Curated annotation (Swiss-Prot):
Signal peptide: none annotated. This is Small ribosomal subunit protein uS9. GO terms for molecular function: RNA binding; structural constituent of ribosome. The gene is rpsI. One of its GO terms (cellular component) is small ribosomal subunit. Pfam families: Ribosomal_S9. It comes from Streptomyces avermitilis (strain ATCC 31267 / DSM 46492 / JCM 5070 / NBRC 14893 / NCIMB 12804 / NRRL 8165 / MA-4680). One of its GO terms (biological process) is translation.
Length: 173
C-alpha cells in the first residue's frame, strides 16, 4: 500500500534573506591569528600525554598547562639537545599551532641517538597536543605531517657482505 504525502506550505517568515550576506565579510584567513584569538580559539589548555618513536628511540611525553618549560630526563631542552636544529625540530608542533609558552613539557626518552630522540620527542609532543584538543589541533598537525611515524630504520647487515648492501671488492682474476 502506498501512502500519499501531504505537502506542507512553507511560511515566508522561515526563509532567510540570503542577500544580506556577502563574501567580503571580515573573517580571519587560515593561519592569520592574533594573540587574542589564540586564547578564544583554543580555550583553556588541557593536560595530555603522547608516545613517540623514531629509529630506536622512544619518548614518553606529558604536556601540562604552564609557561613553556621543558624537562627531558630531568634536564632542560638546551641541556639535553645542545644543537639548535634538534631544539627547533622538537618545538615545531608548538610553532605550527601558535601555542609556544602555553604548555610545560615533561618527557622521558630512552634508546637511539640524538637525532632519533629528537624525532621521537617531536612525534610524542604532536600526539599529546592532538589529544589535548582534537578539534582544533588535528588538522594543522596532520597537514604539517607531525602525526605520522617515520618508520625508517637501519637496514640489517647481511652475511657475505661488509655492510647491509656493500659487497667485498670483486676481482675478476
Amino acid at each position: 500500500m502506498a501512502e500519499t504525502t501531504v505537502e506542507q506550505p512553507v511560511e515566508e517568515t522561515e526563509v532567510v534573506d540570503i542577500e544580506s550576506y556577502t563574501t567580503e565579510s571580515e573573517v580571519p584567513v587560515e593561519g592569520e591569528y592574533t594573540s587574542e584569538s589564540v586564547a578564544s580559539r583554543f580555550g583553556e589548555p588541557q593536560p595530555a600525554a603522547g608516545l613517540g618513536r623514531r629509529k630506536n628511540a622512544i619518548a614518553r611525553v606529558r604536556i601540562v598547562p604552564g609557561t613553556g618549560k621543558w624537562k627531558i630526563n630531568g634536564r632542560t631542552l638546551e641541556d639535553y639537545f645542545p644543537n639548535k636544529v634538534h631544539q627547533q625540530e622538537v618545538n615545531e608542533p608548538f610553532k605550527v599551532l601558535e601555542l609556544e609558552g602555553r604548555y610545560d613539557v615533561i618527557a622521558r626518552i630512552s634508546g637511539g641517538g640524538v637525532s632519533g630522540q629528537a624525532g621521537a620527542l617531536r612525534l610524542g609532543v604532536a600526539r599529546a597536543l592532538n589529544e589535548a584538543d582534537v578539534d582544533n589541533n588535528r588538522g594543522a598537525l596532520k597537514k604539517a605531517g607531525f602525526l605520522k611515524r617515520d618508520d625508517r630504520a637501519v637496514e640489517r647487515k647481511k652475511a657475505g657482505l661488509k655492510k647491509a648492501r656493500k659487497a667485498p671488492q670483486y676481482s675478476k682474476r
